Structure formats: C-alpha cells, structure tokens
Amino acid sequence: MRQWMWFLTTCGAPLALAAQASDSGAFVLTLGKDTIALERYVRSGDQLVDDMLLRNGASVTLRHYVATLNPDASISRVELDTRPTGASDPPLLHGVATFKPDEVFFETTRNGNRQVAHVAVSTGVLPFFNYSYAMYEVIGRRAHALGGNPVKVVVIPFAAATPEDLTVTFPKPDSMGVAFENDAPTRFKVDGAGRIWGVDGRQSTQKVIATRLASVDLAAAQATFANRPLGTLSPLDSLHVTIAGATIAIEYSRPAMRGRTIFGGAVVPWDHVWRTGANFATRLTTSDDLVMGGQTIPKGSYTVWTLPAPAGWKLILNRQTKAPCEAAACALPTRAWLWGTDYAADSDLARVDLKVEPLPRPVERFTIAVEPRGNGGVLQLEWETTRASIPFVKK
C-alpha cells in the first residue's frame, strides 16, 4: 500500500446527499496486496470524463473515455482511447460508440485497422468498461431511473457483439449490489446522490476491493508503475500426461494468493462449490475410462469442481463443459466454454472424497498436477498451505 500512498490525495467527508450537477473523484483498485488499477473521473453537466491506469496485462495501459449523459441516466455517445504508457505512444484502440433507441453503432480503429459494427440492443443500454467505478455510478443512477429492486440494467462492453444483463439491488439506502448472471454481486457503499464510497467485490468473480479518494495523480502513478505490469491476473495453463496408457489433459486458470487468506476466507469460502481455478471452469479430458474414488469415470471431457469444507473436501466431475444455450445455439461450433460461475449440480457425474494435507510452505499460485503412482496416478491440487489429492487407475 505504501508504494502508492504518496501520490494519492485522501478524500474528505461525504458530499451532500442531493444530486450534484458536477462531481469528481478517484478510485484505487486492489487485489489482495497488489494495486491493479487507478481511476480518476470528472462529471460536469452532460459529460463524464474518465481516465484509468491498468496493470492487469502484459503492459501497463492508459484508458481514457468521454461519455455524453442523458437526463434519464442513459448515454448517447462514448469516445474511447486505450494506449500503452508513454505520451508519444499511439492508441492501441480508438473508438466511438453511438447509442440509438434500438442499436449501438461502433466505429473502432485497432492497430490501424478500422471496423464498424451495428449491434441490436434495447433502449437505454449502457456501455461497460471493466473496473470503471465511475461507470458503475451511472449504472446505479440508471437503475434508480428505471425503478424496482432488483432491477435489470443492460450493458454492452465496448465493441462487443452482444449486450449483457446486470442485476442491480439496493439492500439498504446506503448500499448497492451489482451482479452479472450467475455471479455473486459486487457490493457498493453509496450516498444519496449515487456516489460510490467503497467497493467490495470479494464474493464476486473479480475479488477486487476499491477505495474512493478525492483525486489521484495519474502522471505520478504512471511513472511508478510504467514498467511494472502484473500480467494476466489468473493466467491460463494446461498439462498433458500419459499414465498407465491413459492420456489426461487439464486446462485451468491459476489465481495467486497476493497476501490473501484463501481457504475459509473470501476467496474460497468453506462449504461452497469452487470452480477450482479462475475464470472459465477447469476442464479434464481422459482418453480412457478411469476409476477414481471407487467410481468409474468414462473417457471424455468434464469440468472439475471442488467442495472445500473444514471436515473434508469433495472432488466433483461434471458433464457440462460448454456455456448454457437454447435450441439451435447449442449446436454452434462457436459455443463458448463453460464459465466458472455456471455450475449445475444436475450435470454431476461423480462426487468423491479428496485427501487433504498441509504443505510445508505456501504455494503462491494455484497448481494442478497429475503424477504416476503405483499402477495408476494421482491428481493433486495445491494452493496456499493445502494439498488435496486423489489416486486413480485406468479401468
């Protein structure tokens, strides 16, 4: 935390609860001990100007957008620039989105290549920028304008092909929850004017915490973090082994501890089904039938889940490997892999006990291994100071 405190200006007391014509603020976003982004915004009249420094990639990037606000808390136009750090660097992406009653028109230039797209949408759809809490304030105001609790707010990521639904709730006058489909909500501390004063996403997929400040010096932040990207926060990994004549492949994402308590904490709570990784559901494919925990696992592909608990862990193999679909969409070759929040117990193939033991030293990044043992092998999951494992044999 000390690495960025010197270029932050701390916020004062909350502003008046009545809506303001003009407002400004900043957010510092952290994932465990790591600062992953900083945001600064100014809202004046019908214009929202937002600047953000993002570290969650191969390089540190700067994102700038200007949105034109409507009286009903919808948006009519957004212009976006994303560029690497360094004032002379050209934009990686420049784009303009124009919002009409039944469509969004995107004009984008990426690495010199211009593209245009028309996307059919419902009236009042909002743009969505990951980690932009200034835009979450707009989402909250839009939810109030629509009325209801909960209320659905439709958003579309910049240049995306399809919109997405957010569920917005107001549990108390000073709180708001925002959730994507099948995900736990990010929780916000808000005031009567819709300003966000605190963000707790530890129960959601992203796990991010954000703190509001009066301002942030992005130039100083850029100098501090320019050569210190965090890379992909939970990088994709895979393994491919042959044991006792059976070929086993596993694809999964690898979250890191980042100074957090993992098991029994907010990252992996006890007695909740865990995606056993991050992002998309972990997938296991076997070329031959296996026997695991006394149960036969037919050859094929499965998603891998776990149910950690203080008294013991369960390994869950599930038949569902692709995203939920309807009718003809289920046959499309472009159908996405299953996201890690879309677990469906009615598709379980097997639930078996895992052996759980402590590790002599912490494992920073979640790791899956398959190793030979006896006349078969063992599947091992390691993270923090815990190893969970189960032996198997080829049938």
Task: Give names to the regions the model predicted.
Residues 1-4:
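Positively charged n-region of N-terminal signal peptides that target proteins for export
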Residues 6-16:
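Bacterial N-terminal signal peptides
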Residues 23-26, 223-242, 277-290:
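Short acidic, Pro/Gly- and aromatic-enriched capping/linker segments at domain boundaries
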Residues 30-109, 170, 178-180, 194, ...:
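N-terminal mature ectodomain segment of secretory-pathway/periplasmic proteins
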Residues 90-181:
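Solvent-exposed helix/loop surface patches that form functional interfaces
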Residues 188-189, 196-203, 378-383:
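Short, exposed beta-strand-loop hairpins at the edges of beta-sheets
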Residues 229, 251-299, 305-395:
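Extended, well-structured beta-strand/loop surface patches
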